[in-house]
Amino acid sequence: GFQLAADEINAAGGVNGNKLVLVIEDEQGKKEEAINAFKKLIFQDKVLMLFGPTLSNSAQAADPIAQAAKTVVFGTSNTADGITSIGDHVFRNSVTEADVLPVTIATAVKKLGIKKVAVLYGNDDVFTKSGYDNFKKALEAQKVAVTTTETFAKGDVDFKAQLTAIKSAGADGVFVPGYYAEAALICKQAR
């Protein structure tokens, strides 16, 4: 999409006669790589603006570099709280979990009759921790009881112990703020 847009803009004469040049780095969803990519793009490549990173964890680590350099950074799916409070050069186009989760919980309560839930979240990631914190507040506001709270770390593959505890707690549902790799395994093992 970016390349198509740049090609179209450049074919029409660019921006004020200047051609757009895209410089692409892959931060691989890792904080350290995001920091390295931002430093390279800002200080070596001298880019005027950054798009990304996609993950809140990477954004929280790398966006302060852009802010300090007064380089605009635009995150495309940074939903964790606190990202845009890094500074006035940090933007995002996605709503926060604090905005989404209360509506999601209210809908689940109304349509599914959920009265008590178990929570299984990744405790070593900004996105999943923020999701947990916001989910907890939304549950309290809807008066939904939490039967048990279990945690996992990014990269875990065996969730049997947590799922056994969740099952014995008698919840109506399970909330899993997490990424697809762990969430898919949790769903598979929960069956």
Give the predicted meaning of each segment.
Residues 1-22, 140-145:
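Signal peptide-proximal N-terminal region
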Residues 10, 42, 63-67, 109, ...:
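Surface-exposed amphipathic alpha-helices with a cationic face
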Residues 12-84, 152-159:
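Beta-alpha junction/loop-to-helix N-cap segments that form part of ligand/metal-binding clefts
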Residues 41-54, 74-76, 116-121, 170-180, ...:
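Periplasmic-binding protein-like
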Residues 56-67, 157-158, 164, 171-191:
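Hydrophobic alpha-helical
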